[in-house]
């Protein structure tokens, strides 16, 4: 079996794994409601702002933190959005693990940074 056959085999297994099925199903439900999509978009924007603030100031502003907590509480009460975010998180763990396994198999340092 060649590399591409194995890649297709992995794709088939991935397609049917419970975490991917759940992400797919919750994604469909999310797309059925514009308010949920807007809530998710707003949450993502706030997450980005918090990340940016943390990078530049080493701390998230009180205002951003309050907004995140407020929207997070609202999302926690919205089953569709919270289920989607949970499914996305579970999938992200699997995806990161797969990428790590593949990177370890390739075993090539592509950073080209000088090491001191």
Swiss-Prot record:
Matches recorded under Gene3D superfamilies: YheA/YmcA-like
Protein family per UniProt: Belongs to the UPF0342 family.
Transmembrane segments annotated in the record for this chain: none
Top-rank taxon: Bacteria
Pfam families: Com_YlbF (PF06133)
InterPro entries registered for this protein in UniProt: Com_YlbF, YheA/YmcA-like_dom_sf
Protein name per its UniProtKB record: UPF0342 protein CTC_01059
